[in-house]
């Protein structure tokens, strides 16, 4: 029985080693030649002192750097909604935007804590696709 167990372990080890040594090739056959138009609207702010980081601009730059999105310049935006219900889909369709990100940053009074509520809105579907709340300290703003 001991030899059988050893032989079984050896066979399993060989099979596992063979699988580990096999390499898979990933072939990319197509991509996108046009980035998706998106607007990251300046986030609303509720706090006593100016916010040290422009979280909307950071988000827009991160999206641009993926190569998959083309964030709209703020100067071309017709409005600056803070919540999804303030979005006028007709305006965004007119300027060729498919998605809009809106948000609100709040400083919790008397603390170093901040809360960011943001939503991703589909202009074509006229609905919120994602809504999330994250929080952190002032030193964590860029990571929020």
Regions found by a protein language model. Name each.
Residues 1, 22-24:
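Absolute protein N-terminus
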Residues 10-11, 40:
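Detector for intrinsically disordered, low-structure N-terminal pre-sequences
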Residues 15-17:
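N-terminal signal peptide c-region/cleavage motif recognized by signal peptidases
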Residues 24-25, 60, 84-144:
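Amphipathic beta-strand/beta-sheet edge segments enriched in Tyr/Trp
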Residues 8, 35, 47, 78-79, ...:
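A broad, structure-centric signal for solvent-exposed, well-ordered loop/edge residues
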Residues 25-90, 104-107:
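Short beta-strand->alpha-helix linker/helix-N-cap micro-motif
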Residues 1-9:
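Bacterial N-terminal signal peptides that target proteins for export
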Residues 10, 20-21:
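Cleavable N-terminal signal peptides
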